[in-house]
Amino acid sequence: MKHILFACLFFSVSASAQFKADYNAAKESPAIMQYFKPTGNLFVGDCIPFFHKGTYYLYWLLDSAHHSALNGLGGHQWALSTSTDLKTWKHYPVVIGIDEDWEKSICTGSVVVKDNVFYAFYATRLIDKDGKVNEQLSYATSPDGIKFTKQKPNPFYTSAPGYSKRDFRDPKVVVDETGNFHLFVSSSSDSSITRANGAMVHLVSKDLKQWVVEKPLIVGQDDVPECPDYFEWNGWYYLIYGRGGNTFYLQSKNKYGPWQYPSSQALDEDWTNVVKAAAFTNGRRIAAGWVPSKRDGKDNNGEIFGGNVVIRELTQEKDGSLSTKFASELIPATLPAIKPTIIADKTVKELGTASFRITSPDGLGAFYFDKVPLNSRISFEVTVKGPVEDFGLLLRHTDRSREGNGYRFAISPENHTASLYNTTIKAVEVPDKKIRIDNS
């Protein structure tokens, strides 16, 4: 869960009261999940995808005040949306909620099925007897992944020796071949001699009562490695985690490391926060994160917690590194292609219907499409010949006399980057052949 500046709102809650957000799942469209947010002044926080027997379960944090509920402690609860085909979705009311006054937030976690029982592990944010904020581990069980019952003691695990009590959250659960539960917990070390003390705690238990603290999966991180995800895919093990909201991953041929840095960090970009993934049919993996809101609704302002769901499909390269693409089921239907008015400069030669060549050795060459509808899906094919600094689009560029107007999308073969407005993906290889640029 990303730490972002926010204004605190204050609530008075009696000891017997439940914290409730005005979320009515029945009113949400079953046809919309890509870029979904709940109706009204509600938002999506960290996503927790899970796959079981043909159903993709997308648990997500229901955010009602950009993390500022309950004196800034979050007031988050787990909501759920499910699908068997990624096209039609069913939205459920809160499945793990705040039921007690001491529960200040039901934080991020993970789900596993063992012996036909769903186990949801999560952190509960609370105020301890000394008035300090702590994060402690809780879990709930369910026969169907929808109706959960919290288990006692709650919390069942308060802290690991040598690690932070304030930052002890986001447990990722896996069950090994012997039936042991493994939890990977976001925290920081108390003994680090530098400020790079972020660590991924590794807990193991057979009975969910006695827990052994194993060697941490990673240490020496600049920040708490949040919202971990972990899975095996075609002989590679992946550890995914967030730092400052952005998503990073490591890969290994061994279950718990040592880890190697991938050839590219395909999940690291500023417009999607803390991505996690789950299996899907036919060996696929579908990832989900959230697009952060911005202060005052302006993209050039800073991030605030909570936003819209974003879903992508992961692909695996020959070296085990990960890439992303659009899941075909989630690409929206469109009307037939339009033919907008074209305004071109002297560097442009029209080759045929919707086909152009730009020759601009001395600077920028461009042509414009006039009166493009506000909501459009834009795709194009391009072949780059010779050294080119960059190529791309200016989106929603309403004034050609102002270079800074609009959103600049650019691919740079020279710098090996792809950028959109204020976020950049690195290690981009542009082949010497026709490539297709698409969006969804």
Features from the language model and the residues they span:
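Entry beta-strands of beta-propeller and related beta-repeat scaffolds
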Residues: 55-58, 117-121, 179-183, 236-238, ...
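Extended catalytic-interface subdomain
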Residues: 239-242, 247-324
